[in-house]
Amino acid sequence: LKPDDLDSRMFLGDLTFYIHQAGERFALRMKDKNSRLRQEFAGLRWYPIDPAWRVSAHFVPYLSPREVPIEGILGDRSTLPMAGYVTFDLHGSYYKLEGLQDDDGRLFFIFNDLTRKTDTYQVRFLFSTPPANGTVELDFNEAYNPPCAFNPYTTCPLPTPGNRLQVEIPAGEKRYH
């Protein structure tokens, strides 16, 4: 396969097939417009937006991306290139998150927090603003669930031990069921 082939889709009735690449692995994925999961889906649920969960963070870039081992929700393992980490203050305590950097310069965080026990999925994703003068903005109101929160057949990366925050962050997307 070539990178251009990854956008190819094939249709068969209500089914859509496409190639998904995760690291060096390829998978054939299928979407079914009439699946039970889709029919029973009642919509997304979010915490009310709260400006208190928008924080400035100090970004510390690595000299070169650091390959970090990541475990997937289905037990698979891969590595991801972490660009650096951010430190930030929440209610008087400091926290740290490692993140990847996308082509637009934004940082991408795979994290969880203590709300995973009651209200949120066990992993959430969050983008920051691109770093400017060593600072990024984290808006936890925009934290969202990965695909595996909705479909047990989807693989997703789990947070590294350092990205499992020992604080409740009641902001962003909740579990949908």
Stretch-by-stretch model annotation:
Residues 22-25, 98-106, 124-130:
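A short, sequence-level motif marking secondary-structure junctions
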Residues 77-120:
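Mid-length scaffold segments of soluble, non-membrane domains
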Residues 13-78:
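Surface-exposed beta-loop interaction hotspot
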